[in-house]
């Protein structure tokens, strides 16, 4: 059942001549309103796994409640806009199976879904706030602001200093009108009240409180007419009828600014209920996981590969190193959530059924790459043969490995999948079925190589040439019989045979390999091995 907040005012105390108010945001239940959540990324680069988890939790909650998941692109900061980033974000969501009900390319009646296309709306509401005394024009130049910061190390553009600055509070109405008439560059700032306590009920953290004396007068509308995040998120959430807002814990300090905007715009009864998600922490638990941490520790932090258009720097993604989308979604869900049981493997459908806000942790979740690899290994065993075959085929294609016989590929995958943690492991574990080994571990064979062993393989090649039953059991019988006939221990010729076939001391049962390679290829590899061992 969806929850929607209303606002109540509690008169707390009068100290001297200052009235202290506490705004308490509490929830009321609405039986008629539909759950609507949004994922609102900025198209500024690769999508961090924390961002994907935010999208996932929004999606799980919406689908469980029979609601809508909206994709909204927050592209108001044009200085940070990166071409191709939006398409990348959509592709990431698609890979994870997270399909928006509304958004760019998905339709919907509450568009446009790019904030850059909603610019006139923000100006309208910013001016409304000014007219009602909740915001003001500020004409300070960047140089003047910098000078003030140098003068006062703890400078905060708020109630303590706003009258010292160039704005519609310190200036007369005539002066303000003249500046506006001249199109003097200006911003619109929120007028944060003094000495008030703002509290709200977070769906994860319970009651959270803030003192307004610690909050500066945030810019709502920039000099170029574009809104800041603070104004845009409130206006868009209201107009798009967002019922619940899930976002990372790092946005918690912005909550009081947004609460004030909901109140000042007169939209208290429509304000969404918030849930601030725990951070994804570095493996040691000290600090938020960053892109640099991944590079330093050798694992990705992006969902998919991201190439910086300016530097051409390529940052690896989970998809490209060989993660299944099912495993990636599963591990993300378990970063800060569990269903209260020992179950660890969940399909997207199961996550939708079992997801609950009550089971989200307040504290941050350590990222464990080895655990992530475990999830992937388990999902390689769990997904259908058809799906796994297709995934491996895509990996092979990306590496230029040609597969002519898909039935043979299916047999090979079934043979080696228990040895694979990542999809890319199939290249090492199965690539030799489709091309001769590029390297051979001859150092493990040459020291003990003898004329007797060479004679054995020449004879075994001749046997293979005429054998009719090329099954693994038949090959094993003939191999062992010949070894006995030649007076050799099976173990003494088994390792050379494996290295001739695959290049190293790895892989499944050697006769299974030989059977799948086929008669001609096995004979060719034996001959190639003999030639290499002569040098």
Give the role of each language-model region.
Residues 58, 89, 129, 133, ...:
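Residue-level signal for inorganic ion chemistry
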Residues 1-30:
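N-terminal amphipathic/basic-hydrophobic helices that include classical n-h-c signal peptides
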Residues 37-43, 71-75, 240-246, 310-315, ...:
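Glycine- and acidic
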Residues 147, 154, 175-183, 385-390, ...:
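Short, glycine- and charge-enriched coil/turn segments that flank and shape catalytic ligand pockets
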Residues 268, 273-440, 502-535:
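Catalytic adenosine-cofactor/nucleotide-binding cores of aminoacyl-tRNA synthetases and other
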Residues 137, 141-293, 300, 314, ...:
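Active-site cores that bind ATP or allylic diphosphates and position pyrophosphate for catalysis
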Residues 23, 29-154, 253-265, 327:
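N-terminal Rossmann-like or analogous alpha/beta NTP/dinucleotide-binding catalytic cores
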Residues 445-501, 506:
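C-terminal accessory/binding modules appended to enzymatic or scaffolding proteins
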